[in-house]
């Protein structure tokens, strides 16, 4: 509970002129050797009606003098007790400190307010369970180099403590302390200063690290390489430039910039590079599957004109990185056919499928290229894009008519027949009669013989009429160019039909006429 006097003192802002020194002393508004005290606003006081001080500044002075009455008044006026403790320490007024110690949770909280090293150490000593390492840690935190200098002997002996404090100085970015520790005692490993500088993006500390490193006479190339890799990977241009002052290979920087898509870094160095080096970086960008913006940047420095096309295509296929092709395509530079040709010629069907999907290439186009390169495996695998077997047969059959060279047609016919042979019995029956006519038209004797055998295995009641009609239809298809083997197959089946006595008189006459036609063609063939 506040007394009436305390309430008056707390809220009295204007002192009447009639108040003399005696009245002010009775009210507790008089500071011995200083004069009357008057509150101004929330943060300041007026002494003797002519000197203005902050409440906390006045608290320090009053506590240093050991004037607890004034301290209590200033605390009523919302002063900070921490400043009273600081003042008491400066004046060695420990009785005053003990008066308020129950109100202090942790003396470490007062340390940031202290500028003087001796007072800092005295304040830390009030925390009963703290030792020298704790003091030194807080000295670094609050940049109190004189305290560290005082305990230099101990730091010489305690190597682990010295290394720990050096790391803390890095974390809290205390450059003077870092310099002092390294120059007076040395630390085991300076890598920590670089690692923390990079993580905090602190270029000043990074530069200091090199000053300390080269003061030792250390010019280790591997360390420069590591720093270039790390800083370039993070896209830290100014750190890269700082490192390059001391040496290192710029190619490391460029490789990392491409790998991690740091265009600002790339743009800075690309203008200094010859064309052949930029082309190498483009290949690396394809290998690393760089972003569209990175590829565009590299291509723009090449004016979207790539001279090493073959090598570029090899990288596109090998690393399944087709974005560069799509970018060039937008610039009306079409490399899709070249990519497809190279992929089909040299790579597996899996790689072909990946390229086909990424570049949205029509499967018919892939199959035609595969036929041209005699890649049966790719033809078969690509045809699986049509899941329905009957659809696959129809599409491949239609493609036969578009192929001009004979060896390609023969290869595709074998693929078609392979698909047919793997069909289920019911599915075979749906296509066999159509395929038979197709095989005759394409002079595929082996396939025609197989399909005729399959026809003969059908149910007799259903087989005879359809097979008879098939043979009659086939006789209409044959020409002078029809191969001898097909003619012999037809001849045998016509004779079989006569033997089975399943032909009408008109059909017999037609059969004899057609048989004569077959024999005539055979004679011509001989």
From Swiss-Prot:
InterPro entries: MGF_505
Stated induction or repression of this protein's expression: Expressed in the late phase of the viral replicative cycle.
Keyword hit for Cell membrane: no
Matching Pfam families: DUF249
Keywords tagged on the record: Late protein
Superkingdom field: Viruses
Family: Belongs to the asfivirus MGF 505 family.
Main function: Plays a role in virus cell tropism, and may be required for efficient virus replication in macrophages.
Protein name according to UniProt: Protein MGF 505-2R
Higher taxonomy: Viruses, Varidnaviria, Bamfordvirae, Nucleocytoviricota, Pokkesviricetes
């Amino acid at each position: 509970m506040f007394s009436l006097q305390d309430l008056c003192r707390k809220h009295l802002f204007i002192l009447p002129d009639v108040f003399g020194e005696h009245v002010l002393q009775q009210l507790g508004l008089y500071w011995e050797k200083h004069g009357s005290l008057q509150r101004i606003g929330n943060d300041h006081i007026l002494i003797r009606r002519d000197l203005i001080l902050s409440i906390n500044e006045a608290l320090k002075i009053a506590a240093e003098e050991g004037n607890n009455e004034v301290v209590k008044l200033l605390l009523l006026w919302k002063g900070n007790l921490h400043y009273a403790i600081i003042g008491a320490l400066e004046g060695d007024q420990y009785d005053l400190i003990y008066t308020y110690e129950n109100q202090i949770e942790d003396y470490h909280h007062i340390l940031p307010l202290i500028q003087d090293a001796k007072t800092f150490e005295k304040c830390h000593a009030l925390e009963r369970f703290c030792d020298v390492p704790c003091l030194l840690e807080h000295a670094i935190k609050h940049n109190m180099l004189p305290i560290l200098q005082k305990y230099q002997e101990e730091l010489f002996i305690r190597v682990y403590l010295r290394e720990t404090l050096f790391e803390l100085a890095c974390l809290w970015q205390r450059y003077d302390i870092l310099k002092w520790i390294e120059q007076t005692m040395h630390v085991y490993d300076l890598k920590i200063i670089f690692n923390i500088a990079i993580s905090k993006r602190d270029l000043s500390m990074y530069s200091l690290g090199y000053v300390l490193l080269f003061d030792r006479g250390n010019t280790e190339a591997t360390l420069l390489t590591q720093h270039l890799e790390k800083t370039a990977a993070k896209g830290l241009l100014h750190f890269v430039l700082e490192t390059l002052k001391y040496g290192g290979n710029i190619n490391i920087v460029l490789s990392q910039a491409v790998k991690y898509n740091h265009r600002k870094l790339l743009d800075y160095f690309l203008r200094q590079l010859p064309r052949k080096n930029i082309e190498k970086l483009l290949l690396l960008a394809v290998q690393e599957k760089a972003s569209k913006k990175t590829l565009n940047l590299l291509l723009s420095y090449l004016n979207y004109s790539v001279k090493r096309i073959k090598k570029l295509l090899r990288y596109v296929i090998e690393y399944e990185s087709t974005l560069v092709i799509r970018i060039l395509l937008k610039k009306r530079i079409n490399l899709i056919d070249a990519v497809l040709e190279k992929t089909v010629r040299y790579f597996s069907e899996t790689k072909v499928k990946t390229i086909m999907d990424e570049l949205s290439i029509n499967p018919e186009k892939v199959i035609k290229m595969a036929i041209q390169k005699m890649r049966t495996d790719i033809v078969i695998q690509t045809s699986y894009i049509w899941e329905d077997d009957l659809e696959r047969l129809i599409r491949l059959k239609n493609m036969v008519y578009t192929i001009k060279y004979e060896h390609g047609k023969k290869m595709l016919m074998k693929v078609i027949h392979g698909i047919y042979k793997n069909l289920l019995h019911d599915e075979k029956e749906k296509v066999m009669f159509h395929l038979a006519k197709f095989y005759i038209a394409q002079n595929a004797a082996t396939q025609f013989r197989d399909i005729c055998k399959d026809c003969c295995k059908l149910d007799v009641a259903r087989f005879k009429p359809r097979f008879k009609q098939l043979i009659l239809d086939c006789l209409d298809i044959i020409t002078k160019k029809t191969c001898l083997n097909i003619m012999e197959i037809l001849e045998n089946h016509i004779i079989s039909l006569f033997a089975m006595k399943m032909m009408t008189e008109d059909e017999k006459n037609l059969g004899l006429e057609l048989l004569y036609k077959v024999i005539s063609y055979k004679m011509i063939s001989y």
